[in-house]
């Protein structure tokens, strides 16, 4: 598969900042002009010039790019296209740049996800042999019945030294005039059996 059209010539240039090899398609009509090349990794600008002043054409083996610099043969009679950059550091070679995928941004879980996770854990702690599907269904019903912004209350009675959860988070505002309704079905069952 050829990525360069016949009216362009493909040259390879090494970025002077990050040392990445760049493939540059230079139009044949622009081979006599200086071409600006922008690196896709570090956004450094390099300049590609076909005939720098007072420099003889280099062979591909003499060029600092080594095997990556290919001769420009399509439009210029087998002369290589050297790279000229004002910030060239040929004395200090750098390690090749490794392209890494961007890291995913970790977001905090939503209120719904936090509630569901905690509720399923509570239900499974109270009833360890309940299937996850049923625990999820119960947690979803509890989400629909309660206001997740309020926390659950724990009450202690004098007759029982162990604390038990007897009421769910406070219901929505439209239920505020009614009695507080327990929304944790599993705890209702525990109270009846206990």
Curated annotation (Swiss-Prot):
Keywords: Developmental protein, Differentiation, DNA-binding, Flowering, Metal-binding, Nucleus, Zinc, Zinc-finger
SUPFAM superfamilies according to UniProt: HMG-box (SSF47095)
Zn finger region (C4-type): 15-42
Domain of life, per lineage: Eukaryota
GO cellular component terms listed in the entry, alphabetical order: nucleus
Similarity-based family: Belongs to the YABBY family.
Task performed by this protein: Regulates carpel specification in flower development. Severe or intermediate mutation in DL causes complete or partial homeotic conversion of carpels into stamens without affecting the identities of other floral organs. Interacts antagonistically with class B genes and controls floral meristem determinacy. Regulates midrib formation in leaves probably by inducing cell proliferation in the central region of the leaf.
Official protein name in the record: Protein DROOPING LEAF
Species of origin: Oryza sativa subsp. japonica (Rice)
Gene name of the record: DL
